[in-house]
Curated annotation (Swiss-Prot):
<dbReference type="InterPro" id="IPR011650">
    <property type="entry name" value="Peptidase_M20_dimer"/>
</dbReference>
<keyword id="KW-0963">Cytoplasm</keyword>
<keyword id="KW-0031">Aminopeptidase</keyword>
<feature type="active site" description="Proton acceptor">
    <location>
        <position position="173"/>
    </location>
</feature>
<dbReference type="InterPro" id="IPR002933">
    <property type="entry name" value="Peptidase_M20"/>
</dbReference>
<feature type="binding site">
    <location>
        <position position="196"/>
    </location>
    <ligand>
        <name>Zn(2+) 1</name>
    </ligand>
</feature>
<dbReference type="InterPro" id="IPR010161">
    <property type="entry name" value="Peptidase_M20B"/>
</dbReference>
<keyword id="KW-0862">Zinc</keyword>
<dbReference type="InterPro" id="IPR001261">
    <property type="entry name" value="ArgE/DapE_CS"/>
</dbReference>
<keyword id="KW-0378">Hydrolase</keyword>
<dbReference type="InterPro" id="IPR036264">
    <property type="entry name" value="Bact_exopeptidase_dim_dom"/>
</dbReference>
<dbReference type="Pfam" id="PF07687">
    <property type="entry name" value="M20_dimer"/>
</dbReference>
<keyword id="KW-0479">Metal-binding</keyword>
<dbReference type="Pfam" id="PF01546">
    <property type="entry name" value="Peptidase_M20"/>
</dbReference>
<feature type="binding site">
    <location>
        <position position="379"/>
    </location>
    <ligand>
        <name>Zn(2+) 2</name>
    </ligand>
</feature>
<dbReference type="GO" id="GO:0006508">
    <property type="term" value="P:proteolysis"/>
</dbReference>
<feature type="binding site">
    <location>
        <position position="140"/>
    </location>
    <ligand>
        <name>Zn(2+) 2</name>
    </ligand>
</feature>
Length: 410
């Protein structure tokens, strides 16, 4: 498979789990280790303009092989894996010619079952790369990295026409910092694609508007034996606060274009409690209303408290729906759709119920929709990717590059 699988297996051997709440970028040393290994690989493969920034963003270029002017385009993937599940000592399992039924993950009781994951019914006969049940796999987004590099290596060998192609591998995407230090001007592409999606055919240019909501609740602790009229239990207030958040609008109750409120963490004592929510909505007006709801709940629950006891809400916008930017450049989507169809893939246009580096970059002047990788069930032990899906992603990347050149030909 032209080293595609070998590349992927090599990349997932690096522990690149990012870490929230860390000021430095990248947030973990493992990401820099992978970046340096990729830098060396790109040098050996003959790529040009290879730059590794101090924040761990690796960029490189494949120069045009045609005489006419072609818009420079880019392909981007991220090096980190989710902080929500271990990415250390990943031990991939390779199952060729999947015949259906449960797949044992390692030697324990963990299985990958089509009962829980019906998509497996569509993958009979495919080669599946799974976890051993102890870690995530890292197809999000090391499959994307392997696909981009493999596609460009094949482009060089095939002599298919293409213009200048830029590539970038970013750190800390999973914690929302992937594009924070991305130099759009130096990248010098007219548009780009993140290769960070899921199943074959996924093409995404809509994502959530996102905000982080910190709720600080200050109570008053006294001996419970003499607490009447004096104690203000911050934990009780925290419970009341959460009871006012619409239960039917949680992640486990929503899908498609529905937004949600998600209680991500809570901790506390009688004296103080802290709740962390994330709020998401595709519609900008709905997004603003959700943030206002969080403020309104605080006002309602905190009404009548002693001045020394209070509920404080801090809201920080994280990213916005890139549709606002990408839909101004419809040819970018049309190009990707045509490339997929040319590769016998029917595009599956769907909203991203999350975010990507592309969301940030689109608002920095680099329109950047998202392409599939062939992976499934990200951020956990049931994550897997198909080799056939990865091969199709490689083909689509190559076809996008070729079509861009052909359409620019005088």
């Amino acid at each position: 498979m032209d080293k595609l699988l070998d590349r992927f297996l090599n990349y997932v051997s690096f522990d690149t789990q990012s870490k929230s709440g860390v000021r430095q970028v990248p947030s973990t040393d493992g990401q820099l280790k992978l970046a340096r290994a990729l830098q060396q690989e790109l040098l050996e493969l003959g790529f040009e303009q290879i730059v590794l920034s101090k924040q761990g963003c690796l960029t490189a270029a494949l120069p045009s092989n045609v005489a006419w002017s072609v818009p420079a385009i880019g392909f981007i993937s991220h090096m980190d894996t989710s902080p929500d599940f271990s990415g250390k000592n990943v031990n991939p399992q390779i199952l060729e010619n999947y015949r259906g039924g449960d797949i044992a993950l390692g030697v324990g009781d963990e299985v990958l079952s089509p009962v829980m994951f019906p998509v497996l019914h569509q993958l009979l006969g495919h080669t599946l790369i799974t976890t051993d049940g102890k870690t995530l796999l890292g197809a999000d987004d090391k499959a994307g990295i392997a696909e981009i590099i493999t596609a460009l290596v094949r482009l060089k060998k095939s002599q298919l026409p293409h213009g200048d192609i830029r590539i970038a591998f970013t750190p800390d995407e999973e914690i929302g910092k992937g594009a924070q230090f991305f130099d759009v001007k130096a990248f010098n592409a007219q548009w780009a694609y993140t290769v960070d999606g899921g199943g074959v055919g996924e093409l995404e240019y809509e994502n959530f508007n996102a905000a982080s909501v910190q709720v600080k609740i200050v109570g008053n602790n006294v001996h419970p034996g003499s607490a009447k009229g004096v104690m203000v239990n911050a934990l009780t207030l925290a419970s009341r606060y959460h009871q006012h958040v619409p239960e039917s609008e949680s992640p486990e109750q929503t899908e498609g274009y529905q937004g949600f409120y998600h209680l991500h963490s809570m901790k506390g004592s009688v004296e103080r409690a802290d709740l962390h929510y994330i709020v998401r909505d595709f519609d900008r007006n709905g997004f603003e209303q959700r943030k206002q709801t969080m403020l309104d709940i605080a006002e309602k629950v905190g009404a009548g408290l002693h001045p020394d006891c209070y509920i404080e809400v801090t809201i920080t916008d994280t990213y916005y729906n890139m549709r606002e930017q990408v839909e101004q450049h419809p040819h970018i989507i049309a190009l990707a759709q045509q490339a997929m169809r040319d590769c016998s893939i029917e595009p599956n246009m769907k909203p991203i119920r999350g975010g990507t580096d592309g969301a940030h970059l689109s608002f920095q002047g680099l329109p950047c929709p998202n392409l599939f990788t062939g992976g499934y069930n990200y951020h956990g032990k049931h994550e897997f990717v198909t080799l056939e899906g990865m091969e199709k992603a490689v083909s689509v990347i190559m076809r996008i590059a070729e079509l861009t050149a052909l359409r620019a030909k005088p």
